[in-house]
Amino acid sequence: MMRIAVGLEYRGVGFCGWQSQPQACGVQDAVEKAVSAIAGEAITVTAAGRTDTGVHAALQIVHFDTTSVRPLTAWVRGVNSHLPAGVAVLWAREVDAEFHARFAAFERGYRYVLLNHPVRPGLNAGLVGWHHRPLDVACMNRAASPLIGRHDFSAFRAAECQARSPVKELRRALIERRGDYLLCDFRADGFLHHMVRNLMGCLVQIGAGGRPPEWLHEVLAGRDRTRAAPTFEAAGLYLTHIRYPARFALPESSERWPFA
């Protein structure tokens, strides 16, 4: 028995999120079907994170166990030949049995790509978020700065979130303008369900002048989801960054997507 780690990228459009579904519409369903075809046996994969419907991954890392001996290229090119458009294997590595795609990760990162332009996206529809009014990036960064550190993020937690604790350590919250796009980066030891999209909803209100920067810290301190802004759309959210202990020697990000 050997354990294989695989790096993936995918568009969330057209899938019911990452997790396997009874109607087989999850990205996981497509990946397991393709890997099983190459392995010649039923394969179950475990992912670093479970993205929601419409959320993308510039890098998702999964592992699986198999008795089938294949060259690593088979787990890349062979699996890709069985995957639908919008999903691709980037690389494959053999890892030891101690590696676990979910539990061995000690940091994850998301990037929200937001088109800030009066006209809605056409070519990038479904791949970026959108806000039509000018956004003040400096105000958004001032608002986000006090969130860095270990806090109770209950105010940004979805009602259906299954995390045991709302306390997370946010290590990065940084917004950068690149032409008409805002690239909004978040890194933490873990994320609550809808946490990034709920933060984005608040930051966009602040950037548009609807709220002062101090409001975001007040929402955080209040720990009340009803005091925060509505959840922002899924379209612009990407899983981008997964860190493991150095001994596993796995890439922690991908530079090949256009918003890297």
UniProtKB/Swiss-Prot annotation:
One of its GO terms (molecular function) is RNA binding. It comes from the Bacteria. Pfam families: PseudoU_synth_1. Its EC number is 5.4.99.12. Gene3D superfamilies: Pseudouridine synthase I, catalytic domain, C-terminal subdomain (3.30.70.660), Pseudouridine synthase I, catalytic domain, N-terminal subdomain (3.30.70.580). It is an enzyme of class 5 (isomerase). Belongs to the tRNA pseudouridine synthase TruA family. Formation of pseudouridine at positions 38, 39 and 40 in the anticodon stem and loop of transfer RNAs. NCBIfam families: hisT_truA (TIGR00071). Homodimer. This is tRNA pseudouridine synthase A. The lineage of its organism: Bacteria, Pseudomonadati, Pseudomonadota, Betaproteobacteria, Nitrosomonadales.
